[in-house]
Amino acid sequence: MFIGEYQHALDPKNRIIVPAKLRDGLGNKFVITKGLDGCLYAYPLDEWRILEDKLKTLPLTNKDARSFVRFFFSGACEVELDKQGRGLIPQNLKEYAGIEKDIVSIGVLSRVEIWSKEKWSEYNESNIDFDSIAEKMNDLGI
């Protein structure tokens, strides 16, 4: 399980330096893809396989399902870290997430979300009504 928030930056060669606490769970090789809300999602390989299996069951006849699978898999790639915990994020994914230098990585249960520092700040400063969200979670039994 991934938890916590970590602020860091791309190195001079535009590589992400994965914080040690997140690296332990992700492993030296993981999958990164376009996430929702303008961030990137990083999954350990075993979690990625579970997600693949679930998405394979979506009906091809459903347009929204096809669109989501295309969105999710078209940006996906494996990232392999070097001994210092650095890995290269493809340019198309950096552009999608608006990542230029400063990064915030957050642990979210089975995945790591990678945000540009600016987008993460905007997200947290937006008018999200957490009380309303909490009420909806109650409706889901949480």
Curated annotation (Swiss-Prot):
List this protein's GO terms for biological process: negative regulation of DNA-templated transcription initiation
Single GO term (MF)? DNA-binding transcription factor activity
Q: Does the keyword Ribonucleoprotein apply?
A: no
Its signal peptide is: none
**Coiled-coil ranges per the record?**
none
Please give the PROSITE patterns that the UniProt record associates with this protein. Answer: SPOVT_ABRB (PS51740)
Give the matching NCBIfam families. division/cell wall cluster transcriptional repressor MraZ
| Protein name, per record | Transcriptional regulator MraZ
